[in-house]
Amino acid sequence: MTVLGHPRSWSCRWWPLLLLLLLTGREPGVEGVTHYKAGDPVILYVNKVGPYHNPQETYHYYQLPVCCPEKIRHKSLSLGEVLDGDRMAESLYEIRFRENVEKRVLCHMQLSSAQVEQLRQAIEELYYFEFVVDDLPIRGFVGYMEESGFLPHSHKIGLWTHLDFHLEFHGDRIIFANVSVRDVKPHSLDGLRPDEFLGLTHTYSVRWSETSVERRSDRRRGDDGGFFPRTLEIHWLSIINSMVLVFLLVGFVAVILMRVLRNDLARYNLDEETASAGSGDDFDQSDNGWKIIHTDVFRFPPYRGLLCAVLGVGAQFLALGTGIIVMALLGMFNVHRHGAINSAAILLYALTCCISGYVSSHFYRQIGGERWVWNIILTTSLFSVPFFLTWSVVNSVHWANGSTQALPATTILLLLTVWLLVGFPLTVIGGIFGKNNASPFDAPCRTKNIAREIPPQPWYKSTLVHMTVGGFLPFSAISVELYYIFATVWGREQYTLYGILFFVFAILLSVGACISIALTYFQLSGEDYRWWWRSVLSVGSTGLFIFLYSVFYYARRSNMSGTVQTVEFFGYSLLTGYVFFLMLGTISFFSSLKFIRYIYVNLKMD
């Protein structure tokens, strides 16, 4: 397919767009409602087409042999609409407010055998189209396919040449729009000879009806005329599963672990006379040995610059994820489009770069780091470089296949400008504040110059086992909800239960913190003081489980296929797992650090 011209440049709207997003979290045009008078023209924009089971594989509507104006005029698009693959253009449909149309001819066409074959292929791949009326998306299938698996075998393909538009209004505003092909017979595309032309007449009708619903948000969410699945119901199974796991883990940490610690502290804090009389310097081998390593537990780890960068970027994504969910709870995103979420995510990522710079530089200076500039460069590159490499591959595949998901050059330059003028400077500014406000690392115990030898560890205290346990338990807390999230991002579901999403997100962080504390305690009890990186890897491995789940979802829970969709799915699924590794690794590390400070502060040292 040939790529059509890109929509008019919207660079002049960039800074107003950012300001609107900053103040309201909304995209211009997504929630705006136009007021009409009877007889006013209502513009219908054609947008995109693509396989129903491949949501990210979309093409311009006019890349199909359909009714098309002589000169294609594109609608100016917002950032989120461009990122969502929208390429809206004016159409030949003539619709006027509150004026019904019984049956009007749109155009007459003579299709060659090659054009008919193009339509047949699109219909066999279940192509759907998307139009936009007053910022309301309306969708339908391009054609009809009937296939029987019994003898005699039949394979019939037909094209919908008549569309029935149904629009609901309240006063002077359009509340709902839908398209259907009920009581319409498809035009057969079978039996055409290679040198033969097919004559088609495209028609349409328009029906207006008044509704008592005053606002679009009051209309039943997810009601898309049955084209896409309805909004998901409350996921009680996910909530119960997560709550049970949280109660078990919190109970384990708060009751069992604290009871063990109380016994340890009571034994270790014997006064010197009792300890010396009972040979207190020789600990029983059955006792936990975390007290023995008090002179090594705060020994700074290797690759401290990389560790601080992980913590900084992880803290940034924790803030970004929380911000997105809070904005969704406040009703700042339209249920019909994901474009507003894309725009908000880009804006929040740029603004929260100061968090990554501050956290990374602050902790780096605390643990004695001296290469501050290198730490900032590593922090700002830790996510942006993998993201850029992944996006380059995905965008190249889209571009090679003529997909509208391929970003225009102007959009790429603008996004790069935002990162260079907003994201990177804020990282540096945050790093400066973090470095200047950092105080020396406050360790409850002094660290000896010579490191203590670590005794051999049993297999169940290995890094691999800790990563398996620490990754699987947080993953199991969100596994049910994760299906619905995948079905929304990579499928046709419409997710609006943001309250439950916030609840599950909080559960995920809580489970990660509890697991981290428990695993760190067991590691220290084995006289292994190398907890710094272990705490990050143990719970951060949840990202690996999420990626493995994405492989399972692709193979067993979806009907996605083709190079375009497959490359995008696995590319961004890998990035998603990486982001969860950064977030949960950060939560895990600071939870373990807080726990270790607590137990050693309460331990009386000689």
Swiss-Prot record:
The cellular location(s) given in this protein's UniProt record come to:
Lysosome membrane; Cytoplasmic vesicle, Autophagosome membrane
Q: Name one Pfam family in it.
A: EMP70
Q: Name one GO cellular component term.
A: lysosomal membrane
Q: In its keyword annotation, does this UniProt entry include Transmembrane?
A: yes
Q: How does it sit in the membrane?
A: Multi-pass membrane protein
Write out the GO biological process terms: autophagy; protein localization to membrane
| Similarity-based family | Belongs to the nonaspanin (TM9SF) (TC 9.A.2) family.
Q: What's this protein's name?
A: Transmembrane 9 superfamily member 1
Q: Give the species.
A: Bos taurus
- In the record, what lineage is assigned to the organism producing the protein? Eukaryota, Metazoa, Chordata, Craniata, Vertebrata
